[in-house]
A protein has these predicted regions:
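Short hydrophobic beta-strand element within catalytic cores of glycosyltransferases
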Residues: 125-128
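Conserved acidic donor-binding segment of nucleotide-sugar-dependent glycosyltransferases
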Residues: 143-150, 159-164
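Short alpha-helical donor nucleotide-sugar binding micro-motif in glycosyltransferases
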Residues: 88, 95-100, 117, 153
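A short, well-ordered alpha-helix in the C-terminal region of glycosyltransferases
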Residues: 159, 166-180, 189-192, 196
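Aromatic "clamp/platform" in nucleotide-sugar-dependent glycosyltransferases that forms part
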Residues: 108
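Conserved donor-binding/catalytic core segment of Leloir-type glycosyltransferases
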Residues: 15-33, 39-42, 55-57
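Nucleotide-activated donor-binding/catalytic signature segment of Leloir-type glycosyltransferases, i.e.
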Residues: 67-91
Length: 203
């Protein structure tokens, strides 16, 4: 479902207020996910005239949602360009990825982030947190930033927004890399299953 071939990238001149550059960030709204820093970063780019729309998707913890709403109310009180959806059925989520131009992941603490793998498989160029294990997974197929620094997030977004060729190359790289992880996970799960069968057989 999430394996979407990388699409043909548009030049920055093709984006406008009626057809904005769409960023998607799927993750739980939580303190270590830094959605408010992402909103701040996008606002700074919009203030410079770049037509960007931000879509945040995921359930929320109350304190973090309150913090997000405070920032959103300051920069986009009418929610013209920042959209938040608390729940989207998993079977429909791939449609949101398919409509996006850029995937973003700003977590500062993860184990094995499936959401990052989904974003990679969705054929999107990715701006990503520099905190581990994200660089180990995405390798050289993304543009990295410190998730606690809105200025760095903005620079990473702009680097991708401004370069059609960079977006094209990185989206192809990350999409291919996602296939490797899919096969590795399949092999690992098969190995675990066979071990369980073996253990049960010899009991």
């Amino acid at each position: 479902r999430f394996s979407i071939p990388p699409r043909v990238q548009k030049d920055i001149s093709e984006f406008n207020n009626d057809n904005p550059f769409k960023i998607i960030y799927v993750s739980t709204i939580d303190q270590y996910k830094h959605q408010w820093h992402v909103v701040t970063a996008v606002n700074s780019l919009r203030q410079k005239g770049y037509p960007i729309r931000l879509e945040l998707i995921g359930p929320a913890y109350s304190p973090a949602l309150k913090k997000l709403n405070e920032i959103a109310n300051r920069f986009d009180p009418k929610r013209d360009w920042m959209k938040y959806y608390s729940e989207i059925p998993f079977e429909d989520l791939h449609k949101n990825y398919a409509r996006a131009d850029l995937g973003l992941f700003a977590s500062s603490c993860e184990n094995m982030p499936n959401i990052l793998l989904e974003t990679m498989a969705s054929g999107l160029p990715i701006a990503c947190s520099e905190k581990g294990p994200m660089p180990e997974m995405l390798q050289d197929s993304g543009i990295y930033f410190n998730p606690e620094e809105p200025e760095e997030i903005a620079r990473a977004i702009y680097k991708l927004l401004s370069s059609k060729s960079l977006r094209s190359n990185l989206s192809k790289q990350s999409h291919e890399l996602s296939k490797k992880y899919s096969w590795e996970r399949c092999a690992d799960e098969t190995f675990i299953f066979l071990n369980k069968v073996k253990t049960s057989f010899y009991k």
